[in-house]
Amino acid sequence: LGVPYPELKHRFERLEEALQIAEQMWSDDEGPFTGKHYQLAETINIPGTVQKPRPPILIGGGGEKKTLRLVAQYADACNLFATDIDTVAHKIDVLKRHCDELGRDFSTIKITMQGGQLKPLDDPDGFLRTVEQYAKLGVSLIGLAPGVAPDPVAYVRGLEPLMPRLAAIGQNAIG
């Protein structure tokens, strides 16, 4: 496209600096920010945030060395990119280790995931069993998308009968 695309290492460095800038903007510290990639004379956020102490930060991904460490250090939520129970369980364990290393309470991080591989209308009972397994791991939200559904309205209506059971799974997971 004609726009330089930095290598992965530099993109993660920039992301971390952007998170540091956001944290500083949302605090009482309006002083300068001097990073490797960004330098700001002031970090002012006017008007201030409505959510206190700051808006929640969600970081998506599953990279074990960088992404999940950034989640442990800066985020309130993690959207895992994983496709099966074992992988999600492993990523959560890695995130817990990062939290331990940083002195972060893992329970303060909301775990979400993309469920594009799940096909709730093909096998509703299997889908519900799978969701229950994810809930037991601590996943509190699974994003579903119909993909290239010929009739998205029919897809959503097909999910309607599953809602009471999904609600029960959610209640059991949190209560």
Feature-to-residue mapping (PLM):
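Active-site-adjacent structural elements that line small-molecule/cofactor binding pockets in enzymes
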Residues: 1-175
